[in-house]
Amino acid sequence: MHQMNIEKRIITRRDFIKISAAWLTWSISFFPMRLGGLSRSTPSAGLLDALSGARLSPQAGVDLPPGQQGRVLVNNVSIYDRPSEFGEKVNAYWFDSILPISQVTASPETESHNPIWYRVGSEGYVHSGSVQPVRTILQQPNSEIPAGGILAEVTVPFTDARWSPGKEQQVAYRFYYETTYWVIQLVYDESNTPWYSVLDDKWELVFYVPATHMRLIPAEELAPLSPAVPPGSKKLEVNLREQILVAYEMDEPVYMARVATGARFSTGNYSTPPGWHMTFHKRPSRHMARGNLAANGYDLPGVPWNSYITESGIAIHGTYWHNNFGRPRSHGCINLTPKAAKWVYRWTMPVVPPDQQSAYENYGTLVEIREE
């Protein structure tokens, strides 16, 4: 009888968060989690059963579809003969190297917040935190661009944006996979190669990107998610201790993602502020830079799917400069994978019309940031 009561006990909020974090430890990057039918009132045994099928086996791993690649995010990264820092180093790659990724696996020998490793072809293993999952998907150039422009995303590991159309022209920025930009025109260089004109939303400059490297995003792909759910019945919860985000509809969890929130640095405390907030301001793309063009600091064009929760600029947004979620590391913002950030962007209020670059209202979806 005692055992039956334990198995059927109703989970608390803390239980739910712990179980969620445990599952998400195994599911980074390739396995988004939607939680239809589960709630805080789900018996814990049932919830564990529901999650167990998606866990990775540390021994077997999971094979990935052909064409999966990874971009190195740090100055140099080591390849090991097994998924562990205690393995033998067999190779090393530099920043922006593109690796063939054939499998994802979890290692019991790796730090607990992110034990995910990628198999690099038949060569060895690399830790996922230093590698962005990417693909190379070339696009057909499209001349049907609305007068006000259209949102687009990069569909190759990286592409160089130039000051003028032409592969010999000076590079202005390097744009990365799944970053987003506002395209205003299709043009051709002297060799008749198509380029998109991209309007920079911070400096109000125009850059040029090979049209085969960007996908114009159709309006239906930006349509709101769960539109039948009353806006007041949606809520986001960010748990700073467990570093996860949970979306609720009618108090039932429907989506989860690992995050990386604000951290303490030698230059100051940038912790994400706990309390109640609201997604009152949203932008599908934002060039984030600290200071002016000559200042030292971060300069990140095309940050995708921004849902702002404070007037000071703290936002929930996609991240392409790291893949190491589950530990604080930002300057206050709530970092997600681009796919997870896009889900949040589409699910929350206010709705940004497809032909507009932002929405700023006095209402939005509630966001509770909890310390535990």
Residue positions per predicted region:
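Exported/periplasmic cell-wall-interacting domains
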Residues: V229-P231, Y255, T267-P274, H281, ...
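SH3/SH3-like beta-barrel superfamily modules
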Residues: A45, V90-Q132, Y176-T212
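Boundary regions of SH3-family modules and the immediately adjacent low-complexity/disordered segments
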Residues: T42-D63, Y118-A152, L199-P231
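SH3/SH3-like (including bacterial SH3b) beta-barrel domains
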Residues: P83-F95, P165-Y177
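C-terminal segment of N-terminal export signals and the immediately downstream linker at the start
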Residues: F30-P83
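N-terminal secretory signal peptides
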Residues: M1-D15, I19-F30, G37-S41
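Cell wall/extracellular polymer interaction/catalysis modules
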Residues: Y188-W195, L199-P274
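Short, structured beta-strand/loop micro-motifs enriched in basic residues and often containing a Trp
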Residues: N75-S84, F158-G166
